[in-house]
Amino acid sequence: MTNFIYNKHIISINDLSKKEMNSIIDFSFSFKLKSFNTFLKNKIIAICFLEASTRTRLSFESAIYRSGGTCIGFSDSSNTSLEKKGESFIDTISIISKYVDAIIVRHPKEGAARLASEYSNNIPVINAGDGANQHPTQTILDLFSIKETQGKLDNLNIAIIGDLKYSRTVHSLSQAISKFKKNKIYFIAHSALMLPSYIINILEEKKVEYSFHDSIEEVIKKIDILYITRIQKERLDSSEYANINAKFILKKSDLFYAKKNLKILHPLPRSNELSFEVDKTSYAYYFQQAENGLFVRQAILSSILNKKL
């Protein structure tokens, strides 16, 4: 198998070509068939999270151990020299790079992962989320889940609903979809949480067909994928949040006219934007999607740390 991403930083989904994304996705299927392997034998990977995480951190850790590797690091900065002694972020990354074969970074500030890659002494850096900017490994597992359920990544009708303004998963996924052919994206959000202009510019440049809508009812008969994200309460005042959130809650009744092949994806965690009653429908795929994060992250780590696969 040709390895396109050996020793490569993965900071933005735009760092990966369509060919590279497809390569990772195809490789991920092999890990779903056989999760335990030795691709990361004798490899040490640093997990440096300065922002809360459950699925991303634990799936990365599981991916490392299942592939024979070892991980070190921290899940917050409270007991590090960053917090206690005022050490700079770039010094922290520079030192950590001396101990490991790869560094996985999550940070609340946009651009932090890119900065880490500039001070990692040629040790590959993976962005596990930087502010409202990018979350490339989540996007690849989203694409994997779409291909797994639809059998393709082209010629699809995809609705994205919720927080389009601040959600890094939405920003990454929208850019990734633009690399594939003849997809149409239906964006559904409150006007206060609309897609950033730079994402719209990318879609325009790539000639992606897209439209904006006020409710899921407008598009439910057309779509193959419904990607829903939580409204980020921490970004809004309480009254604004309550008003917006109440309008974007997906219920089982909203799916009455859905196509049989529709699958609902969610990067999780959810708040109340996705009713628990939806979990029992044939459309729900977000828990399988979360599981797929394990296999995709095994494929990514194995690829960047092995010249030959």
Swiss-Prot record:
Carbamoyl phosphate binds at residues 55-56, 106, 135, 138, 268-269. L-aspartate binds at residues 85, 168, 230. Pathway: Pyrimidine metabolism; UMP biosynthesis via de novo pathway; (S)-dihydroorotate from bicarbonate: step 2/3. It comes from Wigglesworthia glossinidia brevipalpis. InterPro entries: Asp/Orn_carbamoyltranf_P-bd (IPR006132), Asp/Orn_carbamoylTrfase (IPR006130), Asp/Orn_carbamoylTrfase_sf (IPR036901), Asp_carbamoyltransf (IPR002082), Asp_carbamoyltransf_Asp/Orn-bd (IPR006131). This is Aspartate carbamoyltransferase catalytic subunit. It catalyses: carbamoyl phosphate + L-aspartate = N-carbamoyl-L-aspartate + phosphate + H(+). GO terms for biological process: 'de novo' pyrimidine nucleobase biosynthetic process; 'de novo' UMP biosynthetic process; amino acid metabolic process. It is an enzyme of class 2 (transferase). Catalyzes the condensation of carbamoyl phosphate and aspartate to form carbamoyl aspartate and inorganic phosphate, the committed step in the de novo pyrimidine nucleotide biosynthesis pathway. Keywords: Pyrimidine biosynthesis, Transferase. Its EC number is 2.1.3.2. Signal peptide: none annotated. The keyword Transferase applies.
